From Swiss-Prot:
Pfam families: Enolase_C, Enolase_N
List of catalytic residues: E205, K339
Protein name: Enolase
Organism this protein belongs to: Bacillus pumilus (strain SAFR-032)
Entry function: Catalyzes the reversible conversion of 2-phosphoglycerate (2-PG) into phosphoenolpyruvate (PEP). It is essential for the degradation of carbohydrates via glycolysis.
The keyword Ion transport is annotated on this UniProt entry: no
Catalytic activity: (2R)-2-phosphoglycerate = phosphoenolpyruvate + H2O
Gene Ontology MF terms: magnesium ion binding; phosphopyruvate hydratase activity
Co-factor note (free text): Binds a second Mg(2+) ion via substrate during catalysis.
Main location (coarse class): cytoplasm
Keyword match DNA-binding: no
Any GO CC annotation of this UniProt entry: extracellular region
């Protein structure tokens, strides 16, 4: 039978060596699910709360034993006897058990671990792949990878202000070829950086983290690497950026302090800069181009670039339907970044994706900078036919685990698998 008979959480480590929550769920019939919870470095002000212990003598205050105990002592007794396939009812129970707007009582890291482990146990009970359980028979779209190959900002110890510079192999015929193209460009970039005497150590998300003369130089260097790898920038491969601009926004003067370049810009000047970069380079996506509370700036950016560039809200929307609804109403952005730990349950995550699609917004399924070997987001990307996934460079097992899972899914789907490439950006004038 599909009834839950045991729930157990433990403290494990993520890709940065920080503690995180792992949850296991068992059913009466032997169904089993395990989930590991990711963690972000640049976090949005309105994200659900990630509960940390605060004991400075243990993991520098970053322990998660409180969240683990919340699963084992509070959530587990309430879950026992539930039908594991009742995902919506279970998520509703978890939300009500916490009782706060931001999941600050039990912790989003505790709640999410349970939510995903339940889904995995249900898929195991039914003996079907996770993506099929989550999305049904119509789960067939492999995502275009958004591969972060130059790291800056909070993800690297260098002088680059923009947090992520990414490549998107939109000209590939399928996911397998897209991954090959991305990997070859990644290796090409390493040789380009080496030839310039630049650092080829990698950052949190597997991308290179060199000191560069400017943010624009990162774009120039990536274009050079694409060409050196034998591909055509703008035709076969597009560029994307995650500015994570809340990290260099100064609340006191309301301006953007690009310390790597020694430049201070207003919102309008930031929009001018993005417009200039889009005119020079094949950029198809910009994430968090302005501060999460700079709604007027985001509106201006959308007015200027929204018809030809995907404008993704991460800190802006935090996978939250209330924040997304506000953005839709105000004509801000045209895409949402989906991070399961920003909101805390699978049900709320899927609600945000559905709202985005109804409004003509795209959805980008995303990892966090502190990741694990858990590959759930790969299944979510296919389950929702989102068409895009952002999960780092083809480097470090915590990133590659997601890409390898997508390769497996593409094999399982065989001739029914779809890869939409440039058509993924259905709401742009391409």
């Amino acid at each position: 039978m599909p009834y839950i008979v045991d729930v157990y959480a433990r403290e494990v480590l993520d890709s940065r060596g920080n503690p995180t929550v792992e949850v296991e769920v068992y059913t009466e019939s032997g169904g089993f699910g395990r989930a590991l919870v990711p963690s972000g470095a640049s976090t949005g002000e309105y994200e659900a709360v990630e509960l940390r212990d605060g004991d400075k003598d243990r993991y520098l205050g970053k322990g998660v034993l409180t969240a683990v105990n919340n699963v084992n002592e509070i959530i587990a007794p309430e879950l026992l006897g539930f039908d594991v396939t009742e995902q919506v009812a279970i998520d509703k129970m978890l939300i009500e058990l916490d009782g706060t707007e931001n999941k600050g009582k039990l912790g989003a890291n505790a709640i999410l671990g349970v939510s995903i482990a339940v889904a995995r146990a249900a898929a195991d009970f039914l003996q079907i792949p996770l993506y099929q359980y989550l999305g049904g028979f119509n789960s067939k779209t492999l995502p275009v990878p958004m591969m972060n190959i130059v790291n800056g900002g909070e993800h690297a110890d260098n002088n680059v202000d923009i947090q992520e510079f990414m490549i998107m192999p939109v000209g590939a015929p399928n996911f397998r070829e897209a991954l090959r193209m991305g990997a070859q460009i990644f290796h090409s970039l390493k040789s380009v950086l080496s030839a310039k005497g630049l650092n080829t150590a990698v950052g949190d998300e597997g991308g290179f983290a060199p000191n560069l003369g400017s943010n624009e130089e990162a774009l120039q260097t990536i274009v050079e690497a694409i060409e050196k790898a034998g591909f055509k920038p703008g035709e076969e491969v597009k560029l994307a950026m995650d500015a994570a601009s809340s990290e260099f926004y100064n609340k006191e003067d309301g301006k953007y302090h690009l310390s790597g370049e020694g430049v201070v810009k207003t919102s309008a000047e930031m929009v001018d800069w993005y417009e200039d970069m889009v005119s020079k380079y094949p950029i198809i996506s910009i994430e968090d181009g302005l501060d999460e509370n700079d709604w007027e700036g985001h509106k201006l950016l959308t007015e200027r670039l929204g018809s030809k560039v995907q404008l993704v809200g991460d800190d802006l929307f935090v996978t939250n339907t209330k924040k997304l609804s506000e953005g839709i109403k105000n004509g801000v952005g045209n895409s949402i970044l989906i991070k399961v730990n920003q909101i805390g349950t699978l049900t709320e995550t899927f609600d945000a994706i559905e709202m985005a699609k109804r409004a003509g917004y795209t959805a980008v399924i995303s990892h966090r900078s502190g990741e694990t070997e858990d590959s759930t987001i790969a299944d979510i990307a296919v389950a929702t036919n989102a068409g895009q996934i952002k999960t780092g460079a083809p480097s470090r097992t915590d990133r590659v685990a997601k890409y390898n899972q997508l390769l497996r899914i593409e094999d399982q789907l065989a001739e029914t698998a779809q890869y939409h490439g440039i058509e993924t950006f259905y709401n742009l004038n391409k």
